[in-house]
């Protein structure tokens, strides 16, 4: 009987420790300047950008993203081969202790597939950033119309 109680107590303690690690990761990872590029209403693929900050003293890994406002979301990296821009999926992002990673046009970004509703300039959508420790950090991204130098990065013509 004591063996069962000890085993149960150990399991409970480990579960609490895992939850504490997830809460710590969530409180040390912050998201700034999240935005989604506005696209024509019939577009099924949009792109999101943001800065991911790690205020902790240990490296953190971003393992993926999703959104209740899209069928799916994937982290991609833009690579130019033979003059053609290609979007390649990235399995995860390492954010150094005390560091940050910028997801921006022409580099790392989030591809958002099949919006649940048309998104116009000024609308917001929820993006969820997942970490290796199990944390899920939600952020509201504002839809922004592309302008100036940024106008040339239209994802509807890139190869995935």
Regions found by a protein language model. Name each.
Residues 10-19:
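Bacterial N-terminal signal peptides
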Residues 1-6:
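Positively charged n-region of N-terminal signal peptides that target proteins for export
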Residues 20-25:
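Sec/Tat signal peptide C-region and signal peptidase I cleavage site
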Residues 26-160:
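Compact, glycine-rich, soluble single-domain proteins
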């Amino acid at each position: 009987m004591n063996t069962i109680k000890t085993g149960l107590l150990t399991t409970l303690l480990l579960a609490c420790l895992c939850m504490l690690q997830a809460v710590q990761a969530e409180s040390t990872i912050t998201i700034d300047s999240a935005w989604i590029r506005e696209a024509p209403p019939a577009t099924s693929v949009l792109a999101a950008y943001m800065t991911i900050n790690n205020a902790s003293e240990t490296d953190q890994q971003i393992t993926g993203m999703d959104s209740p406002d899209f069928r799916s979301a994937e982290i991609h990296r833009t690579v130019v081969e033979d003059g053609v821009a290609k979007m390649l999926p990235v399995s995860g992002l390492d954010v150094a202790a005390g560091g940050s990673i910028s997801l921006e046009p022409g580099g790392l970004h989030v591809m958002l597939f099949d919006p649940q509703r048309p998104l116009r300039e000024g609308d917001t959508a929820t993006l969820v950033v997942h970490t290796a420790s199990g944390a899920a950090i939600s952020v509201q991204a504002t839809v922004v119309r592309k302008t100036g130098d940024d106008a040339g990065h239209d994802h509807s013509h890139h190869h995935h």
